[in-house]
Amino acid sequence: ELAADYWLVVALGAVLTLARFSEAFLVLRVSAFDASPLWGPAAIAMMSIVYAVAAYPAGLLADRIDARGLLAAGLVVLIAADAVLACASSPWTALAGAALWGLHMGLTQGVLSAMVAGTAPAALRGSAFGVFNLLSGAMLLVASVLAGALWQHVSPVATFVVGGALCGVTLLGLL
């Protein structure tokens, strides 16, 4: 049986994922400036490189400090990414937002995995990761549909403002 502390991690991961919609919106944002079509892949590359570079040091740090503190730092970085992307006035500033998004991913994704592993009994670890990923995927779908609706019916800026606000609510819940 999966204990209450596991379900708290699942809930935290689900709420965090609701605050972080698909990276496709990074491509849309950087492409909104009528710049070269190469900016879209550049945004994903930037996010991925920063994510990859940050993941290992964040993992080392997670082994030494409270995971909740590292998740909180990751949420602060995502709020900053949303702010930069909301205020972006050029592909360069949108690219900076994508870099911050990657840093957020590096600070949070491995930590969440470690928290799942640490709260699930060994005999149920595969099932625990399956449930965690199922709910995270469902929340990412919901978040992305909502972000798309905001993008289309309100504005691209509103998408990132609401994303940042949801991150703030998640951060308050974490503290």
Where are these regions (language model features)?
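Juxtamembrane intracellular "pre-TM" segments in multi-pass secondary transporters
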Residues: 1-10
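Short amphipathic helix-loop junctions that connect adjacent transmembrane helices
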Residues: 24-40
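Loop-to-transmembrane helix entry/capping segments in MFS-fold secondary transporters
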Residues: 37-38, 122-132
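Residue-level signature of mid-helix packing/kink "hotspots" within the transmembrane helices
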Residues: 48-56, 137-141
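Helix-to-loop junctions at the C-terminal end of transmembrane segments
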Residues: 54-66, 151
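Structural signature of the two symmetry-related core transmembrane helices
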Residues: 69-84, 164
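Intracellular juxtamembrane helix-capping segments at the cytosolic ends
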Residues: 107-120
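A membrane-interface helix-boundary motif in multi-pass transporters
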Residues: 149-166
